[in-house]
Amino acid sequence: MQEEHVEYYKDGSVKGKGLIVDGKMEGYWEWFRKNGTKMRSGHFTAGEQVGEWITYDQQGQVYKVTNMRKRG
């Protein structure tokens, strides 16, 4: 089963969003600060962080890039 998942802050603004497949995070996900700027983004495979993950500064500019390797 596949579904779009959105998490919200108490004030109703979007906290994070991405795809859930068979109960696990899958594909591209992104998280936001309460002011709407992007905080982090990256990909999941079967619930595991993989590939390039980007952390953004308070202005939404790229702050750090981390390459995640699949375990196993």
What kind of feature is each model-predicted range?
Residues 1-72:
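Glycine/tyrosine- and acidic-biased, solvent-exposed loop/turn segments at the edges of beta-strands
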